[in-house]
Design a protein with these regions (language model features):
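C-terminal functional module detector
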Residues: 1-223
């Protein structure tokens, strides 16, 4: 019964493209995708009530098309109203459902289908059942990584203002040499990652619930 919405807490009138400047603002404004058959007020309200929507972190890679659906081996009951709120709920039989639907399946198995179309490569897809982490799907093999190493950090100190976390640090490679480095989500002009030497990196980074990091390509990485 969860429908997630992502908003842009900026002051520039650019939803999904409100980047932080200097200081401790560390994330891009979020976006919400509503799955509606038509762009009308009635369709929007029905979409929200049905939880047929999802949130992204915004930015160039945050305008993904996400489809999540389930199919059932046996007929299931779909609640058209929330049974936790409405005393009398309308229902219908179904063999499939999409994100946000409330479904009761007394017998039989269900099959989950997820499709993601994004402007950047998909690193992984985590599947949860409530708080239980069921599986992490990665659309690549270890051999596809080559000589690249990715280091990521994420999170917030707590919910609310002043939740920013400082991730200032450094990395040293004992034998391998740094060929190139790409920063991941370094949005602040005063927070950078620098090559100190052929074996060392140093960076300043801040997150406020989002993720950041770097991808380094090494030479002689297997030594």
């Amino acid at each position: 019964r969860v429908g997630i919405i992502g908003n842009s807490d900026g002051h520039k009138g650019r939803p999904g493209a409100s980047y932080p400047g200097a200081g401790w603002f560390g994330a891009v404004g979020g976006l919400t995708c509503f799955l509606m058959p038509e762009l009308t007020r009635e369709s929007l309200i029905k979409c929200i009530n049905s939880r047929h929507h999802y949130a992204t972190t915004g930015g160039p890679s945050g305008r993904m098309l996400l489809s999540v659906s389930m199919s059932f081996d046996e007929p299931a009951t779909q609640y058209l109203d929330d049974p936790m709120i409405a005393k009398a709920c309308s229902t219908k039989k179904c063999l499939d459902a999409i994100m946000g639907d409330i479904v009761h399946l007394p017998v039989g198995n269900s099959n989950l289908k997820v499709s993601v179309d994004a402007a950047s490569p998909v690193r992984c897809i985590d599947i949860f059942n409530g708080l239980e982490h069921l599986e992490c799907y990665r659309p690549y093999a270890e051999s596809d990584l080559g000589d690249r190493i990715g280091v990521l950090w994420e999170g917030a100190e707590y919910r609310g203002r002043f939740r920013a976390v400082s991730w200032d640090g450094s990395a040293h490679f004992n034998k391998a040499k740094i060929s190139s480095t790409s920063a991941v989500n370094f949005f602040n002009r005063d927070k950078t990652i620098d090559s100190v030497s052929s074996s060392d990196l140093a960076w300043q980074s801040v997150t406020t619930g989002n993720s950041a990091g770097f991808i380094t390509e090494l030479t002689d990485s297997r030594s």
